[in-house]
UniProtKB/Swiss-Prot annotation:
Purpose: One of the primary rRNA binding proteins, this protein initially binds near the 5'-end of the 23S rRNA. It is important during the early stages of 50S assembly. It makes multiple contacts with different domains of the 23S rRNA in the assembled 50S subunit and ribosome. Forms part of the polypeptide exit tunnel.
Subunit and partners: Part of the 50S ribosomal subunit.
Keyword Ribonucleoprotein included in the entry's annotation: yes
Entry keywords, A to Z: Ribonucleoprotein, Ribosomal protein, RNA-binding, rRNA-binding
Coiled-coil zones: none
Native species: Bradyrhizobium diazoefficiens (strain JCM 10833 / BCRC 13528 / IAM 13628 / NBRC 14792 / USDA 110)
GO biological process: translation
Entry keyword annotation includes rRNA-binding: yes
Upper taxonomic lineage: Bacteria, Pseudomonadati, Pseudomonadota, Alphaproteobacteria, Hyphomicrobiales
Pfam family for this entry, one: Ribosomal_L4
Alphabetized GO MF terms: rRNA binding; structural constituent of ribosome
Protein name in the entry: Large ribosomal subunit protein uL4
Family stated for the protein in its record: Belongs to the universal ribosomal protein uL4 family.
Length: 206
Protein backbone atom coordinates (compact mmCIF):
# COMPACT_ATOMS: atom_id res chain seq x y z
CA UNK A 1 0.00 0.00 0.00
CA UNK A 2 1.39 3.39 -1.01
CA UNK A 3 0.40 6.69 0.59
CA UNK A 4 1.42 10.26 -0.14
CA UNK A 5 3.52 12.05 2.45
CA UNK A 6 2.75 15.69 3.19
CA UNK A 7 4.37 18.36 5.33
CA UNK A 8 2.61 20.31 8.07
CA UNK A 9 2.31 23.15 5.56
CA UNK A 10 0.36 20.86 3.20
CA UNK A 11 3.11 20.43 0.61
CA UNK A 12 3.91 17.09 -0.98
CA UNK A 13 6.95 15.29 0.41
CA UNK A 14 7.04 12.11 -1.64
CA UNK A 15 5.35 8.83 -0.78
CA UNK A 16 5.77 5.91 1.60
CA UNK A 17 5.18 2.20 1.15
CA UNK A 18 3.09 0.70 3.95
CA UNK A 19 3.25 -2.97 4.89
CA UNK A 20 0.08 -4.90 4.05
CA UNK A 21 0.72 -7.09 7.10
CA UNK A 22 0.11 -4.03 9.31
CA UNK A 23 -2.09 -1.66 7.30
CA UNK A 24 -3.74 -3.98 4.77
CA UNK A 25 -5.68 -6.45 6.90
CA UNK A 26 -9.45 -6.88 6.75
CA UNK A 27 -10.52 -5.34 10.10
CA UNK A 28 -12.13 -7.72 12.58
CA UNK A 29 -14.45 -5.91 14.95
CA UNK A 30 -14.44 -8.73 17.50
CA UNK A 31 -10.67 -8.58 18.04
CA UNK A 32 -10.70 -4.77 18.23
CA UNK A 33 -13.61 -4.85 20.70
CA UNK A 34 -11.79 -7.34 22.95
CA UNK A 35 -8.77 -5.06 23.14
CA UNK A 36 -10.83 -1.92 23.82
CA UNK A 37 -12.69 -3.71 26.62
CA UNK A 38 -9.37 -4.91 28.06
CA UNK A 39 -8.05 -1.32 28.09
CA UNK A 40 -11.19 0.11 29.70
CA UNK A 41 -11.27 -2.63 32.34
CA UNK A 42 -7.63 -2.07 33.19
CA UNK A 43 -8.01 1.67 33.76
CA UNK A 44 -10.95 1.37 36.17
CA UNK A 45 -9.94 2.53 39.63
CA UNK A 46 -11.87 -0.14 41.54
CA UNK A 47 -11.85 1.98 44.71
CA UNK A 48 -15.60 1.67 45.37
CA UNK A 49 -16.45 0.31 48.80
CA UNK A 50 -19.52 -0.24 50.96
CA UNK A 51 -19.51 -1.61 54.50
CA UNK A 52 -20.84 -5.09 55.14
CA UNK A 53 -22.62 -6.19 58.31
CA UNK A 54 -19.32 -7.17 59.95
CA UNK A 55 -17.91 -3.65 59.45
CA UNK A 56 -20.83 -1.63 60.81
CA UNK A 57 -20.21 0.10 64.17
CA UNK A 58 -23.33 -0.81 66.09
CA UNK A 59 -24.20 -2.78 69.21
CA UNK A 60 -24.20 -6.54 69.02
CA UNK A 61 -27.00 -6.83 71.55
CA UNK A 62 -30.13 -8.70 70.52
CA UNK A 63 -32.70 -6.16 69.31
CA UNK A 64 -35.59 -7.43 71.41
CA UNK A 65 -36.67 -10.64 73.05
CA UNK A 66 -37.21 -13.72 70.95
CA UNK A 67 -40.85 -14.34 71.76
CA UNK A 68 -43.93 -12.44 72.76
CA UNK A 69 -43.63 -9.30 70.62
CA UNK A 70 -45.58 -10.52 67.60
CA UNK A 71 -42.72 -9.37 65.37
CA UNK A 72 -40.21 -11.31 63.34
CA UNK A 73 -37.21 -12.83 65.12
CA UNK A 74 -34.11 -10.62 64.94
CA UNK A 75 -30.75 -11.04 66.56
CA UNK A 76 -28.66 -8.17 65.18
CA UNK A 77 -29.23 -4.55 64.21
CA UNK A 78 -26.32 -4.70 61.72
CA UNK A 79 -28.16 -6.78 59.14
CA UNK A 80 -28.99 -5.27 55.70
CA UNK A 81 -32.77 -5.05 56.16
CA UNK A 82 -32.46 -2.32 58.79
CA UNK A 83 -31.65 1.33 58.20
CA UNK A 84 -28.00 1.87 59.01
CA UNK A 85 -27.22 -1.81 58.60
CA UNK A 86 -24.50 -3.29 56.40
CA UNK A 87 -24.84 -3.62 52.66
CA UNK A 88 -25.51 -7.12 51.33
CA UNK A 89 -23.06 -8.07 48.57
CA UNK A 90 -21.85 -4.47 48.31
CA UNK A 91 -18.92 -3.32 46.18
CA UNK A 92 -15.41 -3.94 47.52
CA UNK A 93 -12.02 -2.57 46.53
CA UNK A 94 -10.76 -4.77 43.71
CA UNK A 95 -9.03 -4.78 40.35
CA UNK A 96 -11.27 -4.88 37.28
CA UNK A 97 -8.36 -5.84 35.01
CA UNK A 98 -8.83 -8.84 32.73
CA UNK A 99 -6.28 -10.92 30.86
CA UNK A 100 -5.67 -10.61 27.13
CA UNK A 101 -2.77 -12.40 25.41
CA UNK A 102 -0.02 -10.21 23.96
CA UNK A 103 -0.53 -11.72 20.52
CA UNK A 104 -4.20 -10.71 20.54
CA UNK A 105 -3.25 -7.17 21.62
CA UNK A 106 -0.71 -6.91 18.81
CA UNK A 107 -3.24 -8.24 16.30
CA UNK A 108 -5.88 -5.76 17.52
CA UNK A 109 -3.44 -2.88 16.95
CA UNK A 110 -2.82 -4.06 13.39
CA UNK A 111 -6.56 -4.31 12.76
CA UNK A 112 -7.16 -0.82 14.18
CA UNK A 113 -4.44 0.61 11.90
CA UNK A 114 -5.89 -1.30 8.94
CA UNK A 115 -9.39 0.03 9.71
CA UNK A 116 -8.15 3.63 9.56
CA UNK A 117 -6.29 2.96 6.31
CA UNK A 118 -9.32 1.25 4.75
CA UNK A 119 -11.66 4.13 5.69
CA UNK A 120 -9.28 6.73 4.27
CA UNK A 121 -8.68 8.24 7.70
CA UNK A 122 -4.91 7.69 7.72
CA UNK A 123 -2.57 10.61 6.98
CA UNK A 124 1.24 10.47 6.77
CA UNK A 125 3.37 13.56 7.43
CA UNK A 126 7.14 13.84 7.13
CA UNK A 127 7.63 15.12 10.70
CA UNK A 128 5.72 16.67 13.59
CA UNK A 129 7.95 19.55 14.61
CA UNK A 130 7.63 23.28 15.27
CA UNK A 131 10.39 25.78 15.94
CA UNK A 132 8.23 27.76 18.36
CA UNK A 133 5.43 26.41 20.55
CA UNK A 134 2.65 28.53 19.02
CA UNK A 135 -0.83 27.04 19.24
CA UNK A 136 -2.24 29.52 16.73
CA UNK A 137 0.34 28.52 14.12
CA UNK A 138 -0.32 24.82 14.68
CA UNK A 139 -4.08 25.38 14.39
CA UNK A 140 -3.44 26.94 10.99
CA UNK A 141 -1.47 23.87 9.90
CA UNK A 142 -4.21 21.53 11.13
CA UNK A 143 -6.87 23.57 9.35
CA UNK A 144 -4.91 23.37 6.10
CA UNK A 145 -4.68 19.59 6.44
CA UNK A 146 -8.39 19.32 7.30
CA UNK A 147 -7.75 18.01 10.82
CA UNK A 148 -10.26 18.79 13.56
CA UNK A 149 -10.30 15.50 15.46
CA UNK A 150 -7.12 13.45 15.24
CA UNK A 151 -4.48 11.36 16.98
CA UNK A 152 -0.91 12.23 15.98
CA UNK A 153 1.75 9.58 16.53
CA UNK A 154 5.42 10.58 16.33
CA UNK A 155 8.65 8.67 16.87
CA UNK A 156 10.23 7.67 20.17
CA UNK A 157 10.68 11.31 21.25
CA UNK A 158 8.16 14.11 20.75
CA UNK A 159 9.19 17.53 19.53
CA UNK A 160 8.76 19.81 22.56
CA UNK A 161 7.44 22.74 20.55
CA UNK A 162 4.86 20.63 18.71
CA UNK A 163 3.68 18.82 21.85
CA UNK A 164 3.35 22.07 23.81
CA UNK A 165 1.45 23.80 20.99
CA UNK A 166 -0.97 20.87 20.58
CA UNK A 167 -1.61 20.45 24.30
CA UNK A 168 -4.34 23.10 24.42
CA UNK A 169 -6.17 22.11 21.22
CA UNK A 170 -9.39 20.16 21.89
CA UNK A 171 -9.90 16.78 20.19
CA UNK A 172 -6.22 16.58 19.18
CA UNK A 173 -3.93 14.08 20.90
CA UNK A 174 -0.18 13.69 20.45
CA UNK A 175 1.61 10.51 21.54
CA UNK A 176 5.05 8.97 21.05
CA UNK A 177 5.14 5.60 19.30
CA UNK A 178 5.44 3.84 22.68
CA UNK A 179 1.98 5.13 23.62
CA UNK A 180 0.09 3.98 20.53
CA UNK A 181 -2.99 1.97 21.50
CA UNK A 182 -6.24 0.72 20.01
CA UNK A 183 -8.61 2.82 22.15
CA UNK A 184 -6.97 6.16 21.33
CA UNK A 185 -6.82 5.29 17.62
CA UNK A 186 -10.55 4.58 17.52
CA UNK A 187 -11.70 7.52 19.65
CA UNK A 188 -10.32 10.03 17.15
CA UNK A 189 -11.59 10.50 13.61
CA UNK A 190 -8.20 10.75 11.88
CA UNK A 191 -4.90 9.00 12.52
CA UNK A 192 -1.76 10.95 11.63
CA UNK A 193 1.56 9.09 11.51
CA UNK A 194 4.99 10.56 10.96
CA UNK A 195 7.57 8.70 8.88
CA UNK A 196 9.46 7.96 12.11
CA UNK A 197 6.32 6.38 13.57
CA UNK A 198 5.85 4.16 10.51
CA UNK A 199 9.48 3.01 10.67
CA UNK A 200 9.06 2.19 14.37
CA UNK A 201 5.82 0.27 13.75
CA UNK A 202 7.35 -1.82 10.99
CA UNK A 203 10.38 -2.57 13.16
CA UNK A 204 8.08 -3.55 16.03
CA UNK A 205 6.04 -6.01 13.95
CA UNK A 206 8.94 -7.36 11.90
Amino acid sequence: MELKVTTLEGKEAGSVQLSDAIFGLEPRQDIIARCVQWQLNKRQAGTHKAKGRAEIWRTGKKMYKQKGTGGARHGSARVPQFRGGGRAFGPVVRSHATDLPKKVRALALKHALSAKAKDGDLLVIDKAALEAAKTKALLGHFSGLGLTNALIIDGAELNNGFAAAARNIPNMDVLPIQGINVYDILRRQKLVLTKAAIDALEARFK
